C-alpha cells in the first residue's frame, strides 16, 4: 500500500510542478515520517510546521495522518494552524489552517 501512496505523491508533485499557488488537504493515510509524506514535503510545506498534533482516532488521538499542505512556500503566510478538538463528527480530528496568499 505504501508503494501506491508514494506513486500518488510523486504524481501530485508532477501535476503541481508549475509554481502556481496550491493547497492540498485531507486524510493522507500516512504518518509524517513515511516515505509518502517525505516525498510530498520535498515539494510542499506543512501548515502545522513544527506543531504537529495527532488526528486519529478522534477519541484518543495517537497518530497524525491528516494534513494541510501548501506550495510554493514563498506565496503563503501561515496565520494559524491547529487540530480542532471535535471528536464527534468523524473518526479523525479536523485540521484547521488560516492562510494568506501573498501577492507576487
PLM segments and residue spans:
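Active-site regions of metal-assisted phosphoester/phosphodiester hydrolases
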Residues: 1-104
Amino acid at each position: 500500500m505504501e508503494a501506491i501512496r508514494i506513486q500518488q505523491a510523486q504524481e501530485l508533485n508532477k501535476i503541481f510542478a508549475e509554481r502556481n499557488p496550491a493547497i492540498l488537504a485531507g486524510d493522507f493515510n500516512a504518518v509524517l515520517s513515511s516515505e509518502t509524506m517525505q516525498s510530498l514535503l520535498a515539494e510542499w510545506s506543512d501548515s502545522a510546521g513544527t506543531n504537529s498534533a495527532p488526528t486519529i482516532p478522534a477519541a484518543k488521538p495517537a497518530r497524525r495522518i491528516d494534513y494541510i499542505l501548501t506550495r510554493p512556500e514563498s506565496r503563503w503566510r501561515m496565520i494559524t494552524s491547529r487540530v480542532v478538538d471535535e471528536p464527534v463528527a468523524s473518526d479523525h480530528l479536523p485540521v484547521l489552517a488560516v492562510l494568506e496568499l501573498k501577492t507576487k
